[in-house]
């Protein structure tokens, strides 16, 4: 067991922190912390358990320390989940992960709001103090600063979703572009030169697709097919014999309508595809850069919030010490006044007895 005269100041030793987490890790406490919003009685019970273990820690100190650890864990968890650089250092990460992982799955919004824990912590401290007590005006400026900050990780989550949507839209556009080119390259049956346009479809065939039967497409029938000639005979004009198309160019894939060989795409189509690919790569790089910058900014904001919370907790501890010293001084003064009053009454009684005895004599 740790020393009984442990410091009740600002710094927490590793043994104290480990003891606090082991107490909060019990099923009774962690369930009450997740289900009860006003949990002052929970931290009172935790403070009593800490005193039984030999550490003098008040309810507010236990609450503030757990809030700081939760904010550090949430920062490291988000950095690890989004893979934005190296995750920040978080002491007791494994223990906190066992305590808070279930809360992330069941109630993520409540845990994300703990990123701005300083504001809520100060409000709980003010609500728990009786009106008229000393030391409540010390944290007014810190509450104003903490109130200006919004929940940090909601912003990170929204920006990450926006980046993912933009990336998926670009990938979908590229996929549609490739599909339209593939369909257009294999749709026409004629060997004539296709007419190209700048519409959403890369190019359209000059001749309508062949509507022959599957047997004709497979080349089983010996009859001539419209797809094997470049033009049709016109009435009144002698038709010239057409040379049969080689099997390498007329053959089709079994089970499909696309020919085995197709003409390569034109140069402008290749240039356009390369330009689209370069644009997508540049936008992806820009999105990654913006996401890294946003992550750094949010980490800085969270660090400032944690520093504000620690300073507020330190000032609250100082105010509690001053109030405790004042109460002790008032009690000592009251005891001294009572002793002086008793001595005065005793002397007065003796004086009266002497006067009475002199009068009788």
From Swiss-Prot:
Residues 174-198, 217-272 are annotated as: Disordered. InterPro entries: Myb_DNA-bind_4. It comes from the Eukaryota. Pfam families: Myb_DNA-bind_4 (PF13837). Residues 187-198, 226-249 have a biased composition (Polar residues). Residues 11-70 form the Myb-like domain. This is Myb/SANT-like DNA-binding domain-containing protein 7. It comes from Homo sapiens (Human).
